[in-house]
From Swiss-Prot:
PANTHER family: BOWMAN-BIRK SERINE PROTEASE INHIBITORS FAMILY DOMAIN-CONTAINING PROTEIN, BOWMAN-BIRK TYPE BRAN TRYPSIN INHIBITOR. The gene is BBBI. It comes from Hordeum vulgare. CDD domains: BBI. This inhibitor interacts with two molecules of trypsin. Belongs to the Bowman-Birk serine protease inhibitor family. One of its GO terms (molecular function) is serine-type endopeptidase inhibitor activity. Sequence repeats lie at residues 1-62, 63-124. The record marks R17, S18, R75, S76 as: Reactive bond. Keywords: Calcium, Disulfide bond, Protease inhibitor, Repeat, Serine protease inhibitor. Disulfide bonds join C9-C62, C10-C25, C15-C23, C32-C39, C36-C50, C67-C121, C68-C83, C73-C81, C90-C97, C94-C109. This is Bowman-Birk type trypsin inhibitor. Coiled coil: none annotated.
Amino acid sequence: AGKKRPWKCCDEAVCTRSIPPICTCMDEVFECPKTCKSCGPMGDPSRRICQDQYVGDPGPICRPWECCDKAICTRSNPPTCRCVDEVKKCAPTCKTCLPSRSRPSRRVCIDSYFGPVPPRCTPR
């Protein structure tokens, strides 16, 4: 396992329960970061995954929101998603945060994200 985390962010971290944890980021990407030593193929030939392990915190999430109740996603696997939730403040990972059309005091992150459907913010 490397001393420096080979990814900037990770949405699908798989970590051991040890302290500190040993983590692998299972995010599917078109190109692995330059810091990744072992970049392997996925089922889809256009996607790759960094197979490096890192000892410690897997780092921040990549998607532009932490959770989403109203996700609009493509049917691809993994999907491309947008979140149309109206929030008080967009997540720090959101690049384009605009006022809601229906409620200007609320905000909507209009970024698209390629990866797993985000978790819900409120339980069903």
